[in-house]
Amino acid sequence: MANNNSDRQGLEPRVIRTLGSQALSGPSISNRTSSSEANPHFSKNVKEAMIKTASPTPLSTPIYRIAQACDRCRSKKTRCDGKRPQCSQCAAVGFECRISDKLLRKAYPKGYTESLEERVRELEAENKRLLALCDIKEQQISLVSQSRPQTSTDNTINGNFKHDLKDAPLNLSSTNIYLLNQTVNKQLQNGKMDGDNSGSAMSPLGAPPPPPHKDHLCDGVSCTNHLHVKPTSTSLNDPTAISFEQDEAPGLPAVKALKSMTTHQRSTQLATLVSLSIPRSTEEILFIPQLLTRIRQIFGFNSKQCLYTVSLLSSLKNRLPAPRLLAPSTSTKLKEKDEDKKLDDDSAFVKRFQSTNLSEFVDLKKFLISLKFNINSFSKQSEKPANDQDDELLSLTEIKELLHLFFKFWSNQVPILNNDHFLIYFNNFVEVVKHLSTENLETNNTTKSTVTTNHEIFALKLLMMLQMGLLVKIKMEKIKYTVPKNPKAKYARLMAYYHQLSLIIPKNPYFLNMSTTSLPSLQLLSLASFYYLNVGDISAIYGVRGRIVSMAQQLRLHRCPSAVLSVHSNPVLQKFEQSERRLLFWAIYYVDVFASLQLGVPRLLKDFDIECALPISDVEYKDQLSMENEKADKKAKKIQLQGQVSSFSLQIIRFAKILGNILDSIFKRGMMDERITSEVALVHENALDNWRNQLPEMYYFQITVNGTVNLDEIRATNQRNTETKFDKKDIILFEKKILLLFYFLAKSMIHLPVIATKPLPKNVDNATKKKQSMFNNDSKGATNQDHMILDVDMTSPAIRTSSSYIILQQATNATLTIFQAINSMYLPLPLNVSRTLIRFSLLCARGSLEYTKGGALFLDNKNLLLDTIKDIENDRLLDLPGIASWHTLKLFDMSINLLLKAPNVKVERLDKFLEKKLNYYNRLMGLPPATTTSLKPLFGSQSKNSLENRQRTPNVKRENPEHEYLYGNDSNNNNNSEAGHSPMTNTTNGNKRLKYEKDAKRNAKDGGISKGENAHNFQNDTKKNMSTSNLFPFSFSNTDLTALFTHPEGPNCTNTNNGNVDVCNRASTDATDANIENLSFLNMAPFLQTGNSNIGQNTIENKPMHMDAIFSLPSNLDLMKDNMDSKPEQLEPVIKQNPENSKNNQFHQKGKSTNMEKNNLSFNNKSNYSLTKLMRLLNNDNSFSNISINNFLYQNDQNSASADPGTNKKAVTNAGANFKPPSTGSNTSQGSILGSTKHGMDNCDFNDLGNFNNFMTNVNYSGVDYDYIVDASLGLAPLLVDTPDISNTNTTSTTSNRSKNSIILDTTFNDDLDRSRMNAREVLNPTDSILSQGMVSSVSTRNTSNQRSLSSGNDSKGDSSSQENSKSATGNQLDTPSTLFQMRRTSSGPSASHRGPRRPQKNRYNTDRSKSSGGGSSNTDNVSDLFQWQNAK
């Protein structure tokens, strides 16, 4: 107690006793008493702190004062005498004297106010949601009360109730207006609307009562006020109500929106980035535009954050890596040969199974051995230790163990098979295998075929169940095949083998024939489809989904089982089949809904076609049995439903109905409207809450006042020991968390459309003004570092204050938290956990952009995201199927961390951080650290004998040896002696230059990329023209190239049959080193010299180097076709035309080079073609306006024919922006300017802008690449339309226009002689276009036409032709697409410039044509930086 008092006194105002003062008079004491009664705040504390004295003399009576001044004296900054209970200052004016505890209070943590504001927003959103739900329920009550007949006893009650409803505020809510207007819409549709009943229809009490539920027929359009048990999506009353005529088609708004994007280049670039992200899943379709827009607002479209995010989203579309199929570790060479033979046998069986009909496998014993079943163990009651031959096979005991795991964790998730029914089949199967093992069973050929076919189908079902059990066992016991001499490593090898077999089961000819459709085969395919959903195999889901739905409809599973089966069947068998049919149908329904969610397409099974009733739960079944026993004496007959599932399975089927209804509303025509989606979201919220309230008591979860669950409690339940066995209580808790996960998943899908349909937030005017003033004040001493700060509005109030946005963020955080709580076990969910975690993590990171860096909310989100990354990493180390690849995981980690960083972080720190991440993942994969800090230039090593290398100033290495950036030369040519040099080329950096020269010589001796004269010229010319280090404060580093372009898994490491892990790792190491060493040719290959036929692949020690572009090929490779794949001979004319170039080209390997080129041509062309298409999509601003979509998708392979110079000039002057239709023949290539015929991808000279632009324009597109198509009808078109200032948009965008309209893409710009000499940073507004940045780097010119001739491999005749055509091109402006590699130039005078004051130049560029030594190369031929679109801030 003493300690408590002392602590309390320490926190109270300190009392000072003053001696020698006069005694207090009587009236003063009375005043103090009255004052203390009026102000008792500190009276008690002061009494406890005061020291009483008994001195009788007045002079010795002490006066007590407080050491701290009162609040009024502190605010007025006057001296306080500290008298108690009222100081003199307060007593003089009659104010209450108060002393607060401000000096002793600790400061609130950072972000405390923000957390309070966020909580207020959450409470307001939840209050708004609950009020809307109450409105819906009260409205339903009122509508139901109108439909029933009223009696005389409750007329007065109903009258008062109606009167109260009229006066209630719920009549004014938008929800009720939406519900009640459906009746008006129905009357308008039927043409029965008139002025008399229009007013009453709007009233909730004047609306006509709806028909009873049993007599109600839904039309899907005007009866949304009913919460249907069967959601509707089409019209039943009037099939002609929906029109698809040209003037009424629902796609017209999307077409108009896309057309209006011609004047809104910012929207065009957003659409391009969205298309590059290839949105496929439903979540990505809805949130990608908002995510990329927010990143643009904070970081910019050309930032590392945007680049890595788009790369991450694109990598999600690749097929997830399969587990390695490895052989068991052996000690002797003899055993190694045996194991190699076993691997060959396994591969042969896989190929045979895929091509041979299942009915042709007549030998059941060999078939089971090929499935790794130890049939000898089936006949032994007590198993003996397995020998070497049976060591890799599954014994009967192990099979039973894995089946137990399946029924414990998977069976309730996918209620396809009943446990009791399966045991009957399994015991029968075991008996058959026992006879096979002892070879006592002999059957004739007539019955063997049918019997073994059924047993083989059951064996395949058993294989799928064992694979699911293996996944649980490996995750639970953390089994790794890399651990030496691990006795359980065989489970990992079996998992890889079963995964390979499971992918080809639907491809067997037996299942492709619809005449063999049966319940067992459909059960097998349904199990396989659920497995594909879990591992995220998109192509397999597409292949099986439609087939199982067609088979289910063929077997009439959607009808009532009692009506389909024959009445003459055996009653026992009839009940048995009814149960199987009912369970199988609803399992297919469940799979179809989640397949629709993953694929981003409408579901196939429509609710209005279904007659099959839901199965009953085991609890209801027990109650039903007890009721039958009670009524047995009365002989009461009641129709009983067959089909029993667990209570959890019934709840997830009911949830699938709700989720299917949500998906129907997303994909329904006309639903992507902000008002409609907000109102429909409340209807779905009501249905979801009803589902939650109807959960059984053991699965029920409570929602807190702010609309979420207690996440701390969920985290606390995750602290159990995973080594202990799961009892029934743990299983119930695990299933409860899964239901929680489904609940928040549905919540996010409800509110994602609401956020997606909101207009994209626009740039703030004051932000652009601040940026403009920043540029104008640069002459006062601003440095490059000052331009790195992006002063943008960090908040978007229109979205952040939205209740749907708040609910979405709550659901996202809750989803990630629940995933972490149950991720210790393998999650048997009908969705790919890895992809789902990445998508929701991006949503969480997007929400973190709104929080204060370092605040409590920001730190909570950061910890949540970092834990999610660690969870995926742990699963990747186990090499489980369906886990994101190392490349995707690396991009995910980098993207999240980049988004969590402040926008003003220096690029050196970002690159240092990214390099650490890159080396971290290399260590995890067993690879050496990435040598991304190599001193080699971007486009290859420089030869010490190069003439150009001796003439120009060498590049300089930065002070930090760990981060080398790619700097170009500081002057363009020798004639530009008066040009200003960069500060980095002064004499103080002489030592660094010497060090760089030595390193360059060493790299050249070590076997650089190129040593031939043509390669030298190409590198010197391209490096000189692509130099951007003197123009931008940021650089695109080798770290970015290595992280984005290098495939870390190595060549064919995931699908190889080689069992030696070391060989695979060595191949990965060699490939990675090769990629890092030859970064320039990873994606520059299509743009090299014409004679370089093996441009797509470099060979090191005769090993092919695997090259991965920034966006890999889509998983559906059959949709991505290249005409050049079947035409390897078309490169021969190119080699003949340039024999000298081919002779000097170092990339033509001797000996086997020709065969290697032909063998690898298809892959290389596809890789280059993919990159080319990517670059064109990203940098072409006319992709949705001036270019025909059909020609864009169906452009044929058209080779340009050689023609005379006159024809070539005509082709140049008449070149247009649009593609020519395929029927018009071959397009005239601008590559014919140089007088050479070039074919396919070789029809461009990289050193000629016209040729390169023609190459980018005339890419051969055969077939449709559906992955790059943007579905504008799903709400993307409303997002892409930037409505304000359409009339004020100027096509010749100036700085003032960009500041006013926030336009990011500039289609054209003036580049006359005076403006071309301006410093580039004036153009580089942080919100400027990628094209504008590309213009900056295209200012520099070539030295001589001879260099151009050497680099392109053309003779002097071609140069003269090029000069002549260049003059013609100057006089006649080309109407070609504006890309990074060719910029439009106008002839407007200097008076047209509105760019403000000129900035001090960092470098001068030789833009005067009179200073060109050759005089033949025009400014239109300048090459910009190929990677400038990826230039980070």
UniProtKB/Swiss-Prot annotation:
Modifications the protein undergoes after translation, according to the UniProt entry: Could be the target of the SNF1/CAT1 - SNF4/CAT3 kinase complex.
Top-level taxonomic group: Eukaryota
Biased composition (Low complexity): 1349-1362
GO biological process: DNA-templated transcription; positive regulation of gluconeogenesis; positive regulation of glyoxylate cycle; positive regulation of transcription by RNA polymerase II
Cell compartment(s), UniProt: Nucleus
Extent of Basic and acidic residues compositional bias: 947-965, 994-1005
Purpose of the protein: Activator of the gluconeogenic enzymes FBP1 and PCK1 genes.
Protein's name in the database: Regulatory protein CAT8
Record organism: Saccharomyces cerevisiae (strain ATCC 204508 / S288c) (Baker's yeast)
